[in-house]
């Protein structure tokens, strides 16, 4: 899935040795499946790991990836380029801009997850939020969960009805209803 060169792995090991114990690596894509897709690497503390993350084992460290972007990371490579000036990580993900939401071979769940990542989450991320598809019930109800700044936000009702639900029902006629399964707790993380 993600080929990390030996030089890059050694670089990560060196960087992680200076971080708090338990800190690992996260690979992410902002706006996956769009022409504006951007790949990145960041530290990932134990508190940053979410239920929908996939844990990849490397030599002396782990990489966490949101399950919904796995298809965009096909044949991706992370390398460390060293020259006279210094060093730089390179991240090549040839499928990061591939739009999988139109792929009819994908399951409905995968298509909705990709749709959320491409069309809804870029807007929500401006407020530090994100929406995830938990599952599709037998009666074609999409069960979703908001995280980050959306959790506990006073505008969540509007976001749910006017953005998320309208768009899902419009683009996926097989979905009959959208239900928010988030246990909304207002706190410092909430946007409003």
From Swiss-Prot:
Binding site for [4Fe-4S] cluster: 150, 153
GO molecular function annotation: 4 iron, 4 sulfur cluster binding; iron ion binding
Presence of keyword ATP-binding: no
InterPro entries: Fe/S_biogenesis_protein_NfuA (IPR017726), FeS_biogenesis (IPR000361), FSCA_dom_sf (IPR034904), HesB-like_dom_sf (IPR035903), NIF_FeS_clus_asmbl_NifU_C (IPR001075)
This protein's UniProt keywords: 4Fe-4S, Iron, Iron-sulfur, Metal-binding
Biological processes, Gene Ontology terms: iron-sulfur cluster assembly; protein maturation
Cofactor list: [4Fe-4S] cluster
Cofactor binding, per record: Binds 1 [4Fe-4S] cluster per subunit. The cluster is presumably bound at the interface of two monomers.
Iron keyword on record: yes
Assembly and interaction partners: Homodimer.
Summary of the function given for this chain in its UniProt record: Involved in iron-sulfur cluster biogenesis. Binds a 4Fe-4S cluster, can transfer this cluster to apoproteins, and thereby intervenes in the maturation of Fe/S proteins. Could also act as a scaffold/chaperone for damaged Fe/S proteins.
Family: Belongs to the NfuA family.
UniProt protein name: Fe/S biogenesis protein NfuA
Organism for this UniProt entry: Buchnera aphidicola subsp. Schizaphis graminum (strain Sg)
């Amino acid at each position: 899935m993600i080929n990390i060169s030996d030089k890059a792995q050694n670089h990560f090991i060196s960087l992680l040795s200076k971080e708090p114990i338990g800190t690992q690596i996260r690979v992410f894509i902002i706006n996956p499946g769009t022409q504006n897709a951007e790949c990145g690497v960041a530290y990932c503390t134990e508190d940053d790991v979410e239920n929908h993350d996939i844990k990849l084992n490397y030599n002396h460290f782990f990489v966490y990836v949101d399950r919904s972007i796995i298809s965009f990371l096909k044949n991706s490579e992370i390398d460390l380029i060293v020259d006279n000036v210094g060093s730089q990580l390179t991240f090549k993900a040839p499928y990061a801009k591939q739009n999988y939401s139109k792929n009819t071979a994908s399951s409905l769940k995968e298509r909705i997850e990709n749709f959320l990542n491409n069309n809804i989450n870029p807007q929500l991320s401006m407020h530090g939020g994100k929406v995830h598809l938990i599952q599709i019930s037998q009666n074609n109800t999409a069960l979703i969960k908001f995280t980050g700044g959306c959790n506990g936000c006073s505008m969540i009702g509007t976001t749910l009805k006017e953005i998320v639900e309208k768009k899902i029902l419009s683009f996926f006629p097989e979905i009959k209803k959208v239900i928010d399964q988030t246990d909304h707790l207002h706190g410092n993380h909430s946007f409003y």
